[in-house]
């Protein structure tokens, strides 16, 4: 029963959906399976909202995906994006660390928010269809990217959450499990993009914070979601076209 409690706790921790309460240690110990669990649930909600509203709004319903995604997450990852944006713009290391705990949003946070919204809206306005499969890929891969970086990157000294998650995830079998999730929900285009983003954010985290933190991981999940969504929509057509052309 304890394992089911840990699995259910992923839902209440990563979304606003009420579920079993658990300690941070319990959540972290089972978080390696959260990309699939949370990814499937949130993709179903994302698609349901867009599908129902598209009956009245047509393709304009795609724009509702942005607020839907953030509401389901409880704006927690978005808060991390704002904090990391401020840290990114701070000049010295101590100011970068301080920015992660500053309740006020600075120019860096607003700037990174505009980048995120611009990317998301550009993606939504550029696609002609929005499939459940693409949403599932984006949800799973963006979360797997964040969780994998928590597992392989040492946390910064002041990040309590980062320390707990890293301690519970830095295990070869759990890391392998996350990689399996990435492969299962990816095609060649997605996997190449995942590897590029993994390297980019890994070096960005080290150059900016000298490690990982909850805010940094929240920023990664937030920024990578629309990127994976676009690649999924574009690559699904290319992948299956090339696959059937070989048969």
UniProtKB/Swiss-Prot annotation:
The chain crosses the membrane at residues 32-52, 105-125, 145-165, 183-203, 212-232. Coiled coil: none annotated. Its cofactor is Mg(2+). One of its GO terms (biological process) is cobalamin biosynthetic process. Its EC number is 2.7.8.26. It catalyses: alpha-ribazole + adenosylcob(III)inamide-GDP = adenosylcob(III)alamin + GMP + H(+); alpha-ribazole 5'-phosphate + adenosylcob(III)inamide-GDP = adenosylcob(III)alamin 5'-phosphate + GMP + H(+). Belongs to the CobS family. This is Adenosylcobinamide-GDP ribazoletransferase. The gene is cobS.
